[in-house]
């Protein structure tokens, strides 16, 4: 088979270059806010992940396997957060611990637009602070990260405690998680679908819907409003009590990142005060967020925010006419100057070399021919402006100033 497994993706040079630029911009924003990177293994022991994500994820979505030469069960990373909890228990970093991880994760989900089985996540988390300013910093940073990438996004924001208060008010506190999971499907199945499913488990379904539609401020704790008060761009915030994502582990503020015209969130996160200490048997407050790079690329290309115009990192192609060895030495001198240089390795004629350069869209040429060499010169050419210039070989550093 020449196709990769369903739900995974090959990245061509154009796509990989775009991916690298996106990651670089995200990292620059994360670092601006004082976050440092860590890297955890792509594979964990199954016992590390077991019991952390809920029954449905464990049975249907986690990639679990055992190799013939081992008796242990392993699993591919389902997210970046449980590995962070394991890392924290092992290394006990000084608090607050502000880390980011940009890595692949795996979920055996049904592939569709914007959804993959192997995908990249850019996570950032603050471990150790229970205060609203930590939550607000995550929201501010995520807004800035998306804007740096060219996206005009808005954040749907809510708080688990608000929905808990609402459900408690109608007398169904014991069914909170079950009710929250149904409410979380509002965007997919609509009000009528949610109402129908709620009626199957409670006789307070219509009252719940009524309260949800009112989106009442009374249910939100004061800590939530302190978070919102610290958000710099409040026009990017849409408070929505129907947002009920991840309440198996989120304990406070939750958010999702949306862009108009795209049918799923581009990222999300929230406060989870009961997870990080799960391995060290203590309560460690934490809040974080994640940028889904795969759907980000999909929607960015679709809306013209990104393009695949850049096909190579190569700045200069050294083109030779029957003088390969001399051209080889010149190419290496240019590399010593810090330039990215291509030289043909198939000993092709001038026409074939140029066909490759055009296909790869390499802008600058250094042409090495017998006549120029006799005068200790090379010809520098800008394919975009069509300008040509003779450069003495002893002054090759001049080329560096001509390359944009």
Curated annotation (Swiss-Prot):
GO terms for MF: ATP binding; histidine-tRNA ligase activity; RNA binding
Name of the gene: hisS
InterPro entries, sorted: aa-tRNA-synth_II, aa-tRNA-synth_II/BPL/LPL, Anticodon-bd, Anticodon-bd_dom_sf, His-tRNA-ligase, HisRS-like_core, HisRS/HisZ
Taxonomic classification: Archaea, Nanobdellota, Candidatus Nanoarchaeia, Nanoarchaeales, Nanoarchaeaceae
Catalytic reaction annotation: tRNA(His) + L-histidine + ATP = L-histidyl-tRNA(His) + AMP + diphosphate + H(+)
Taxonomy, superkingdom: Archaea
Known EC number: 6.1.1.21
Organism: Nanoarchaeum equitans (strain Kin4-M)
GO biological process: histidyl-tRNA aminoacylation
PROSITE patterns on file: AA_TRNA_LIGASE_II
Keyword terms, alphabetized: Aminoacyl-tRNA synthetase, ATP-binding, Cytoplasm, Ligase, Nucleotide-binding, Protein biosynthesis
Subcellular location per the Swiss-Prot or TrEMBL entry: Cytoplasm
UniProt name for this protein: Histidine--tRNA ligase
Enzyme class: ligase
Main subcellular location of this protein, as a coarse class: cytoplasm
Family: Belongs to the class-II aminoacyl-tRNA synthetase family.
GO CC field: cytosol
Pfam families listed in its UniProt record: HGTP_anticodon, tRNA-synt_His
């Amino acid at each position: 088979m020449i196709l990769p497994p369903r739900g995974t993706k090959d990245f061509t040079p154009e796509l990989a270059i775009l991916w690298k630029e996106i990651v670089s911009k995200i990292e620059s924003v994360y670092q601006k806010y004082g976050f440092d990177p860590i890297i955890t293994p792509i594979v964990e022991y199954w016992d590390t992940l077991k019991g952390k994500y809920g029954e449905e994820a464990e049975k249907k979505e986690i990639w679990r396997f055992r190799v013939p030469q081992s008796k242990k069960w392993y699993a591919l990373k389902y997210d970046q957060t449980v590995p962070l909890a394991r890392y924290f228990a092992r290394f006990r970093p000084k608090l607050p611990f502000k880390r980011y991880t940009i890595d692949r994760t795996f979920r055996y989900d049904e592939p569709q637009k914007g959804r993959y089985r192997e995908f990249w996540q850019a996570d950032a988390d603050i471990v150790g602070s229970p205060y609203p300013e930590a939550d607000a910093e995550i929201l501010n940073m995520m807004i800035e990260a998306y804007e740096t990438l060219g996206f005009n996004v808005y954040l749907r924001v809510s708080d688990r405690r608000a929905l808990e208060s609402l459900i408690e008010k109608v007398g169904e506190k014991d069914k909170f998680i079950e009710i929250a999971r149904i409410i979380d499907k509002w965007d997919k199945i609509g009000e009528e679908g949610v109402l129908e499913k709620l009626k199957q488990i409670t006789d307070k379904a219509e009252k719940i819907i009524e309260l949800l539609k009112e989106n009442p401020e009374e249910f939100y704790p004061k800590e939530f409003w302190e978070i919102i008060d610290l958000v710099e761009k409040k026009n990017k915030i849409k408070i929505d009590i129907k947002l009920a994502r991840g309440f198996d582990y989120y304990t406070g503020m939750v958010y999702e990142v949306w862009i108009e015209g795209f049918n799923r969130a581009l990222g999300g996160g929230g406060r989870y005060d009961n997870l990080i200490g799960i391995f060290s048997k203590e309560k460690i407050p934490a809040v974080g967020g994640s940028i889904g790079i795969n759907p980000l690329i999909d929607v960015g290309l679709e809306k013209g925010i990104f393009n695949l115009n850049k096909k190579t990192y190569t700045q200069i192609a050294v083109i030779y006419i029957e003088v390969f060895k001399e051209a080889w030495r010149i190419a290496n001198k240019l590399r010593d100057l810090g330039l990215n240089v291509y030289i043909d390795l198939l000993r092709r004629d001038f026409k074939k070399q140029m066909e490759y350069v055009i296909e790869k869209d390499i802008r600058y040429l250094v042409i090495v021919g017998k006549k120029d060499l006799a005068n200790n010169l090379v010809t520098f050419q800008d394919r975009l402006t069509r300008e040509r210039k003779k450069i003495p070989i002893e002054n090759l550093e001049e080329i560096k100033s001509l390359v944009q």
